């Protein structure tokens, strides 16, 4: 009897992989093990729940049992994996053991909470379950501090503000989206946030949190203080690698794999936010989709290398949305910006005047696809 392909985790990466496997093979045995309910939801929707007045259960697109039945898989929901026995090729879940032919880590990533005094007063919104846990507090809150002005923090700040909250957005950098684009390119979105009423505190970060009679006082490294009702940590994600590390697999920023998504153990693979593919983390939907297509083939006997074209990344800030592609943080690039009443197009050119990256914003988002084709031709 053929052993299972066992997948640990039930997020976007795992579901994409299962669907791709079923396109290629209707009968190969697949077992999905997840510590949560395994219900399907769209994680990017978490950035818009407050303005859309959605509760956690509203996000569910498909129950886990229905997904399992539709794709003919064995489902172990609400089941925590405690160890991997590589010699026996078994996944250990307490007293239960499951044999595997191939094993896939799709364990995702967890939100980072800075190790500061009062960190217990912070909450995170990195999953449907986390939102379910905290939604009552967020609905009641009038003053919200968002720590981290990256992609998720910026999206959350705008959403909370549009929902009528008084929002403070804090980052140690001098501009928003510092890991994604230079300040001159993010400036219009930054202006839009302030026009919406978001208070921006840049070049500083939270040093200490202290509970008061009327909220939580945040003290910053520059000496300022702000009292709020809730604090959301959006400073970044850390790949969930503990299980892989305990199994003596190679781990750095994520679970290390080659271009075939394979770890040094030829029976074990990694996919999604937990995977470090060729030294890179790729925590966006499109590379995960393409990775799932490649991995499905490899689990069934192929040896395909993942190749990724230039891909669009969307910053979902409805009052001034952005799309970007390419090496937007390259230090040797020259940016050309073009503005009109419809929005912005910013192009990053190299020394040979070749397009290496771009950002489009506002109503000029429709120009992204022609630029993406141009970018693909030059890379």
UniProtKB/Swiss-Prot annotation:
The keyword NAD applies. SUPFAM superfamilies: FAD/NAD(P)-binding domain (SSF51905). It catalyses: 2 reduced [nitric oxide reductase rubredoxin domain] + NAD(+) + H(+) = 2 oxidized [nitric oxide reductase rubredoxin domain] + NADH. It is an enzyme of class 1 (oxidoreductase). It comes from the Bacteria. Its main location: cytoplasm. GO terms for molecular function: oxidoreductase activity, acting on iron-sulfur proteins as donors, NAD or NADP as acceptor. It holds the Pfam family Pyr_redox_2. Its cofactor is FAD. Keywords: Cytoplasm, FAD, Flavoprotein, NAD, Oxidoreductase. Signal peptide: none annotated. InterPro entries: FAD-bd_OxRdtase, FAD/NAD-bd_sf, FAD/NAD-binding_dom, NO_rdtase_NorW, Rbx-bd. Its EC number is 1.18.1.-. It is found in: Cytoplasm. GO terms for cellular component: cytoplasm. Pathway: Nitrogen metabolism; nitric oxide reduction. Transmembrane segments: none annotated. One of at least two accessory proteins for anaerobic nitric oxide (NO) reductase. Reduces the rubredoxin moiety of NO reductase. NCBIfam families: PRK04965.1. HAMAP family: NorW. Belongs to the FAD-dependent oxidoreductase family. This is Nitric oxide reductase FlRd-NAD(+) reductase. The gene is norW.
């Amino acid at each position: 009897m053929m052993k299972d392909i066992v997948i640990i985790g039930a997020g976007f990466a795992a579901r994409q992989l299962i669907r791709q496997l079923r396109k290629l093979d209707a009968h190969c045995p697949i077992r999905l093990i997840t510590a949560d309910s395994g219900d399907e939801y769209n994680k990017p929707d978490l950035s818009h729940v407050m303005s859309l007045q959605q509760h956690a259960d509203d996000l569910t697109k498909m129950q886990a049992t229905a997904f399992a039945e539709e794709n003919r898989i064995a489902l172990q929901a609400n089941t925590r994996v405690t160890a991997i026995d590589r010699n026996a090729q078994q996944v250990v879940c307490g007293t239960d053991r499951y044999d595997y032919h191939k094993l896939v880590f799709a364990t995702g990533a967890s939100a980072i909470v800075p190790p500061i005094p009062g960190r217990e007063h912070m909450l995170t919104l990195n999953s449907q379950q986390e939102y379910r846990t905290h939604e009552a507090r967020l609905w009641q809150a009038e003053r919200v501090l968002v720590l981290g002005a990256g992609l998720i923090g910026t999206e959350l700040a705008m959403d909370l503000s549009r929902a009528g909250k008084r929002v403070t957005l804090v980052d140690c950098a001098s501009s928003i989206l510092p890991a994604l684009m230079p300040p001159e390119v993010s400036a219009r979105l930054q202006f839009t946030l302030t026009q919406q009423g978001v208070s921006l505190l840049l070049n500083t970060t939270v040093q200490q949190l202290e509970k008061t009679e009327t909220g939580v006082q945040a003290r910053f490294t520059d000496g300022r203080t702000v009292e709020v009702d809730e604090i959301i940590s959006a400073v970044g994600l850390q790949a969930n690698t503990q299980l892989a590390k305990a199994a003596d697999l190679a781990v750095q920023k994520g679970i290390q794999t080659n271009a075939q998504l394979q770890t040094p153990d030829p029976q074990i693979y990694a996919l999604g936010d937990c995977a470090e593919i060729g030294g890179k983390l790729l925590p966006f939907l499109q590379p995960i989709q393409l990775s799932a297509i490649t991995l499905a083939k490899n689990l069934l006997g192929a040896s395909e290398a993942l190749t990724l074209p230039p891909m669009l990344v969307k910053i979902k800030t409805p009052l001034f949305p952005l799309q970007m592609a390419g090496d937007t943080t390259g230090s040797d690039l020259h940016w050309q910006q073009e503005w009109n009443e419809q929005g912005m197009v910013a192009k990053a050119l190299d020394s040979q005047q070749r397009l290496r990256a771009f950002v489009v914003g506002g109503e000029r988002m429709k120009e992204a696809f022609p630029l993406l084709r141009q970018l693909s031709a030059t890379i």
